Swiss-Prot record:
Species name: Homo sapiens (Human)
PANTHER family: IQ DOMAIN-CONTAINING PROTEIN K (PTHR34927:SF1)
Name the UniProt record assigns to this protein: IQ domain-containing protein K
Taxonomy of the source species: Eukaryota, Metazoa, Chordata, Craniata, Vertebrata
Classification via InterPro entries: IQCK
């Protein structure tokens, strides 16, 4: 059997006597300094209080054990992307100040690039990214900016339905901003040749009148309809309308109107025939 563990002498403290006179006379207690305690303390005996809970500690330890990248993954060093000003992206003939009304752009430092980049890139052999950045975006971005300004004017961001069609506006803008048509007058969307041919083969349904009217015109229509409705609800007006209806039925007004228009059509037909007879009698000069 193992021997019982002995307690060091410097840990033992003297207890005061339990006599009745202890309240008046106390036995002095020897004080022991902290520096004299040189007991070896193991790591499992003392644990520091942590602010994190157990779950956070487990997650932190698991993340520390995991590698930063999966096996077989290679970090690709991508080149530094420089931002070019919008003015250099536009073709000749486009005004960046007109479509981007900003006094100046805050640009980062960049390496100088050749001015005629579009001339050195072959559109048939270049990559899709180079083709978009060189031939598509310089033309399309100003059109998209104008499209957003026009959509704001048409209140597309405020209403659920409008007469504004974004594709039609962009087609019209690109057609009129074509450098090959420099100096030619403005052409409306429905007057563009390929648009006319397309609409002949695939006609569009008519746009509702509520979308074509302006706010002032729509207000006049609504006010006139409401006033007429209020007037017709008057009892005296209703009585007058009933009397007029009975009068039309008694005198056969509808039948008389049909006879009148039939006579008018007959007169017009006879007049057209009389005008056609002298034209047929005219001799055509021989060549």
């Amino acid at each position: 059997m193992a021997a019982p563990r002995q307690i060091p002498s410097h840990i033992v403290r003297l207890k005061p006597s339990c006599s009745t006179d202890s309240s008046f006379t106390r036995t002095p207690v020897p004080t022991v300094s902290l520096a004299s305690r040189e007991l070896p303390v193991s790591s499992w005996q003392v644990t520091e209080p942590s602010s994190k809970n157990l779950w956070e500690q487990i997650c932190k330890e698991y993340e520390a054990e995991q590698p930063p990248f999966p096996e077989g993954y290679k970090v690709k060093q991508e080149p530094v992307i420089t931002v070019a000003p919008v003015e250099e992206m536009l073709f000749h003939g486009f005004s960046a100040e007109h479509y981007f009304p900003v006094s100046h752009f805050t640009m980062i430092s960049r390496t100088p690039c050749p001015q005629d980049k579009s001339e050195t890139i072959n559109p048939k052999t270049c990559s899709p990214k180079e083709y978009l950045e060189t031939f598509i975006f310089p033309v399309l971005l100003p059109g998209m900016a104008s499209l957003l300004h026009q959509a704001k004017k048409e209140k597309c961001f405020e209403r659920k339905r409008t007469k504004f069609i974004a594709c039609d506006f962009l087609t019209e803008w690109l057609y009129n901003q074509n450098p090959k048509r420099a100096g030619e007058p403005f052409t409306e969307f429905f007057s563009i040749p390929f648009v006319e041919e397309r609409l002949k083969q695939h006609p569009r349904p008519p746009i509702p009148l509520s979308l074509l009217l302006t706010e002032e015109e729509a207000a006049l229509y609504i006010q006139s309809f409401w006033r007429a409705c209020v007037v017709r609800c008057d009892p005296e007006i209703q009585e007058l309308r009933q009397w007029q209806k009975k009068l039309r039925e008694a005198k056969h007004i509808h039948q008389q109107v049909k006879i009148f228009w039939a006579k008018q059509e007959q007169k017009v037909k006879c007049k057209m025939e009389d005008d056609a007879v002298p034209a047929a009698k005219m001799k055509i000069p021989s060549s």
